[in-house]
C-alpha cells in the first residue's frame, strides 16, 4: 500500500510502500545492480539500472541481498523491508529515474508496465 506519493508537496522523489519489517523486496525488472549499501538518508539502498535504461532505487532496507555489479532478474529477492535512515517505520522507498536522470512517478511507471499499486485512503 502506498503511504506517501511522488512529489506529495514536499518534493518526495519516490513513493513509500508500507510493509512489515523483513518482508521481501524484489527487483521490478531485469537489470544490473549499480549500488548496494549505505546511503545518506536512505539507510541501506539498492540501485538497479534496468534493461530499459531506467534506474530504480529501493531504500530504507533492513538487509541487502545483492552487490554492485550483480545481474538480477525481475522478481528476484534483492533486499528486505526495513526502517533505516530517515524513516518513520518499516517501508520501501521506491524511486525511478528515466534515462536522462529525471525522477518520474514510480506508481505510474509500474502501472505502465502492468503492475498497478494502490494508495492508502
Name each model-derived stretch:
Residues 1-121:
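Catalytic cores of peptidoglycan-degrading enzymes
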